């Protein structure tokens, strides 16, 4: 079985908690290696053919600071042939004009470098105005809102993982 690399950035701890839940649902640390992007380097990405990328949207539609610091280094990674799933944490009420933008920014960059995006997620059940993470009517990955819909996180993660697990493990 192919081991999966899960790279996340976190400011308040929410994205790390979600990453741990995803790792558990995927089958634990024997299936998924978790790495805080603040501790990662480009070589860490190179050892995986399947990736899960997690980033909260920070401030007004910006990348979380550790992802912002790593962003230019993404250019040094060959994503061709890599399957990449995304998840993000955001606030759809307080930041309705840029809900999940960070997830969209990372997906656009990585897909532009050859990554194959998997794990699109429906926009139904959310109330926002705009998002850079929406393509063809769906989020480019799992959109979570710990501020306004924390009670939906566990079910959303379980549902999403059940969809991406067979794709990432094939």
Curated annotation (Swiss-Prot):
Alphabetically sorted, this entry's keywords are: Electron transport, Flavoprotein, FMN, Transport
Q: Which GO terms describe its molecular function?
A: electron transfer activity; FMN binding
One matching Pfam family is Flavodoxin_1
Write down the required cofactor(s): FMN
Flavodoxin-like domain location is 4-165
User: What is the purpose of this protein?
Assistant: Low-potential electron donor to a number of redox enzymes.
Belongs to which family?
Belongs to the flavodoxin family.
The protein's name: Flavodoxin
